[in-house]
């Protein structure tokens, strides 16, 4: 595996962990992980990159080795502001190459619409996979949020790291033993009771009171000026959420069409965690596009 180095920087009053691969003077790529994930998730893609890159991958607030926010709810706009601060720190004067998976893809694509001059190229890995909400869902959503405020969610614990690895493979049967063991090592830590839990603030599991407004997202996407590559798995998350793979594919194509300069690539034999399932092909697509 390619070696990484850790750095801790101050981002909007929080201590952020940032993982680096490659020479500091090499061309930069920023990689943004998804929900209940962390920067180590990109190790397998980085191992498959053939060109010389300086890969910069933060742990989002409340994930991995980054500091927890201290609030009982995490808000999407904070990720945008955190990303802007990170880019100012590492690339204050130049537009950047962004790669985001899932939540990271959502953040990167909205940011690219809000700050089009700051993004040179964007690769979204299974981003934009949330189901559209309707206004009628608002009362129930607020009720759910209030209920969770009275009964905060927690994180499951495991007796050993091997159990963490087994759980990861249960969630994703395509994950190999070797990769599951690596992820368990970097995703989990022992608590005071000697049990293992994911390195994440349990508050991330609290439902957002805000609905997913697709029209607002597509408006942001329409403002993107950078070339965008949407990479989806053969078994995309949106298709699973819609209980229809063909309908999910059609929805992905509809949404991507909102981006002026965009293309879609599908990775065979991969699901939502395509960076774990087929990192060789994902790395090839990334470098071909960049």
Annotate each PLM feature.
Residues 125-158:
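A catalytic-pocket lid/entrance helix-loop region that shapes and gates access to the active site
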Residues 223-270:
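Conserved loop-alpha-helix segment in the C-terminal half of the alpha/beta-hydrolase fold
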Residues 93-138:
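Conserved hydrolase catalytic core segment
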Residues 1-29, 50-53, 92-94, 129, ...:
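Alpha/beta-hydrolase fold catalytic core
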Residues 17-68:
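Conserved HGGG/HGGXW glycine-rich cap/lid loop of the alpha/beta-hydrolase fold
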Residues 258-290:
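Catalytic active-site module of serine/aspartate enzymes centered on a nucleophile-bearing elbow/loop
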Residues 11-14, 57-99, 267, 284:
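Active-site loop/oxyanion-hole signature of alpha/beta-hydrolase fold enzymes
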Residues 154-214:
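Conserved alpha/beta-hydrolase catalytic His-Asp/Glu region
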